[in-house]
């Protein structure tokens, strides 16, 4: 999924809301940084994440994001949850965050099944 795909999907889902591209990009950065810090950095393959999570309005909108399909829905879920929070729609916020948390759990399981644990000196780094 690309940055523009996330922006378009959020706009499609939240049709009655005022949505700023920069705000969506900031939320994408938050999700990417969480993925890097809590999922990717504890396993091999973390060198792939070096160029992610630092997007701004100058970043090309066709930039691919870190989470692969089918786990890439976490970006849309998180952005929608933040909009729901701003509009004080607690029921939708809870639903969006539940979907986001489920997606993150699935992404973490997939990443950790497909990437070996990092070895620091002679010991493995503790994780999940």
Regions found by a protein language model. Give the residues of each.
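Charged interaction segments
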Residues: 88, 99-101
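Structural motif
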Residues: 64-74
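Short helix-capping/linker segments at secondary-structure and domain boundaries
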Residues: 83-93
């Amino acid at each position: 999924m690309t940055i523009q795909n996330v922006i378009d999907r959020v706009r499609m889902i939240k049709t009655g809301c005022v949505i700023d591209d920069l705000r969506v990009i900031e939320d994408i950065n938050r999700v990417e940084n969480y993925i890097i810090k809590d999922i990717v950095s504890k396993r091999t393959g973390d060198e792939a994440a070096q160029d992610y999570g630092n997007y701004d309005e100058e970043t090309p909108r066709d930039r691919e994001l870190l989470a692969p399909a089918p786990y890439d829905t976490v970006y849309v879920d998180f952005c929608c949850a933040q909009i729901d929070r701003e509009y004080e729609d607690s029921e939708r916020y809870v639903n969006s965050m539940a979907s986001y948390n489920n997606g993150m759990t699935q992404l973490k399981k997939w990443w950790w099944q497909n990437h070996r644990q990092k070895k620091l000196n002679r010991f493995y780094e503790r994780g999940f």
